[in-house]
């Protein structure tokens, strides 16, 4: 067992793990899991998840058992199947990335409140960003096809954020990105699409378009934040694409 005590530790510890360890277990949230995935990217070996974070989207995506015994069995005996990450500036993400209101909320989260209050920190940040909301516009080019949007969510699988299904047909073992593109419809539009997400009706959100792509180029307000797996990882302009190779992800036997 190795403990990550500061930013960058999880990636470094995974990268430097002794070769006799045939499986790397990431204990933490989606950001920690992504950091570990980046650490093993150059020489992939099976990655298992022990979900201890705020949202644990990837754990929900693959159906990690809730009980300790089930999790131990999965880590020890579960098959490692390929999962295709996304990539931003050479860094991998495993669940989702976002630009627009979504990323503004992540950027506004108070780390101290996140440690104490978990998901409440995101709710509080969302309320603040909604109050301060200013319409924005971005150009998104997905595999050569242009879109004009106010917000973009990119996922590798079905789920996003707190387990909301934005791409019900998506599979982690398919080398494509799933895009939810939302027109800029102001504060009311933000409320509408997030209400649709909460009630599992993202496909019916006003001004929503859905697509798949391997490469997405995004231009908009220079310096606007870009989030991936719940952490700010870049700023506009940015390119998001499918990673050049999959990682072996340990899953429950039922998967």
What are the residue ranges of the model-derived segments?
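N-terminal glycine-rich "phosphate-gripper" loop used for MgATP/nucleotide binding
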Residues: 26-30
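ATP/nucleoside-binding phosphotransfer catalytic cores, i.e., glycine-rich phosphate-binding loops
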Residues: 141-147, 171, 181-255
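Catalytic core of DAGKc-family lipid kinases
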Residues: 4, 41-46, 50-151
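Glycine-rich phosphate/pyrophosphate-binding beta-alpha loops
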Residues: 98, 102, 153-166, 232
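Gly/Ser/Thr-rich active-site loops/lids in small-molecule metabolic enzymes
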Residues: 111-121, 162-189
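Short glycine/serine/threonine-rich phosphate/pyrophosphate-binding segments
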Residues: 10, 31-36, 57, 83
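Short acidic/glycine-rich loop or secondary-structure boundary segments that cap or lie
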Residues: 102-105, 148-149, 160-163, 187-190
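ATP/NTP phosphate-donor binding region
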Residues: 1-24, 34, 69-70, 240, ...
């Amino acid at each position: 067992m190795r403990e990550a005590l500061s930013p960058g530790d999880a990636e470094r510890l995974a990268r430097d793990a002794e070769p006799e360890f045939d499986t790397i277990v990431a204990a933490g949230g989606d950001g920690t899991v992504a950091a570990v995935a980046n650490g093993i990217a150059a020489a992939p070996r099976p990655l298992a998840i022990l979900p201890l974070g705020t949202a644990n989207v990837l754990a929900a995506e693959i159906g990690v058992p809730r009980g300790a015994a089930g999790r131990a069995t999965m880590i020890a005996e579960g098959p490692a199947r390929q999962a295709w990450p996304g990539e931003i500036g050479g860094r991998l993400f495993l669940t989702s990335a976002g630009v627009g209101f979504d990323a503004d909320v992540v950027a506004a989260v108070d780390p101290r409140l996140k440690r104490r209050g978990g998901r409440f920190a995101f709710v509080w940040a969302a309320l603040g960003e909604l109050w301060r909301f200013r319409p924005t516009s971005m150009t998104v080019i997905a595999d050569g096809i242009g879109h004009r949007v106010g917000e973009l969510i990119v996922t590798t699988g079905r789920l996003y954020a707190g387990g909301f299904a934005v791409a019900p047909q998506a599979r982690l073992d398919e080398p494509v990105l799933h895009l939810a593109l939302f027109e800029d419809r102001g504060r009311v539009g933000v409320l509408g699409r997030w209400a649709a997400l909460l009630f599992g009706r993202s496909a019916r959100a006003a001004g929503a378009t859905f697509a798949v792509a391997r490469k997405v180029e995004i231009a908009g307000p220079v310096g606007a934040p870009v989030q991936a797996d719940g952490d700010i990882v870049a700023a506009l302009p940015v390119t998001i694409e499918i990673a050049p190779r999959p990682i072996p992800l340990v899953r429950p036997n039922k998967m």
